[in-house]
Amino acid sequence: MTLVHDLSSALEGKREEIVAWMAQKRSEIDVPIYGSVDIRDAGWKIAVVDANQFPAGFNNTSESDLPHLTERIAAHIERHHPVCHWVHIYPESHTRNQGYVENLRTLCQLVELAGYRCTIGNPELDGFDALNGIHGPLPLHQVEVVDDVLLVQGQQPDFILLNNDLTDGDLEGLSTKSVLPRPQMGWYQRKKSQHFDFLRPLIEEISEIIGIDPWHLICESFVSEEKCLEKEACRIQLASDVDVFLAKLAQRYAALGIDREPVAYVKNNRGTYGLGIMTVTSGQQLLNLSNRKMKKLMYGKGNSNTEDFLIQEGVPTLMQTDAGAPVEPVVYLVDGDASSWWYRINPKKDDMG
């Protein structure tokens, strides 16, 4: 069985070629101002299992990473908006999620450390002077939209940092080019599968350089389209799709000597915040869904109906704490750079999360 960990010497030997390849790719792509990815290390596969264009956990980053995060934020803003002095953060409308409030607080701190004035707010939060976070209140600023122009206390900021995933659709006041990430990246338009479609050719290229089968560096996945689980015919077809997918995984596992039962994640292709996700080891489990679980799978954030499902290989994590709790690395990227790593630990979950 191939263990990715055994490739350390090969990676070191190809260091210069890999660094040059990455530099070339960055020059060809307009990298986002920020994003985050969840990674699973199974030993025989190390792969990104989820990606977020509007990361909401900056409060989890290490204090020692703040200088580098600040440096990368400043570099990105200077490159795209060289005359910027004022950055406005356009947040989600979570008023009770204290963890998210702390994310905003840290994000604002990074912007201010980069040398910019920073304000926070959106029109839906105009009834609030502040949001209550874990470490106290976070002040908000009055926001209104006039003729599709976003104004903060009557003035237009130089740059809008979007920290709202736009599940319910595009919003007024965000049509200006001074908004990053682009609103078109919102969940109302973006799909989870697009991340893997974009990632796959890159993985294939780097795998050829390293000398490894790309299967060891990416999740297997496909999209089962136009499915409404309220209709029995759709559920039967989706279950059949899952069974075919799992059978192919089982064949690959057997060929590689991987002694475990394949697992598939069934995900709302537009889903977020962990909604519209379940794990299965057979299509029959979908046919046996209770009404409650079926509705949970069908709806994403904002109660949006689900028709397309991403069927994704479940990659277990071999990383764990001394007490045996599973550990999942999370990478926060700023300006195309892996700027901060932290680890998600949940003793209530198994190695599949």
What is each stretch, according to the model?
Residues 1-129, 232-236, 248-263, 273-275, ...:
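ATP-dependent carboxylate activation and anion-phosphoryl transfer catalytic cores
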Residues 54, 164-167, 268-271:
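Short glycine-rich anion-binding loops that position phosphate/pyrophosphate groups of nucleotides
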Residues 69, 140-146, 151-155, 175-177, ...:
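Active-site nucleotide/adenylate-binding loops and adjacent lid/helix of ATP-dependent enzymes
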Residues 87, 160-161, 179:
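Receiver (REC) domain switch-region micro-motif
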Residues 94-99, 166-169, 185-188:
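Short acidic, S/G/P-rich loop/turn micro-motifs used as interaction or catalytic elements
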Residues 105-125, 175-187, 201-213:
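Structural alpha-beta junctions
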Residues 115-154:
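A short, well-structured beta->alpha microelement
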Residues 148-173, 183:
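N-terminal glycine-rich "phosphate-gripper" loop used for MgATP/nucleotide binding
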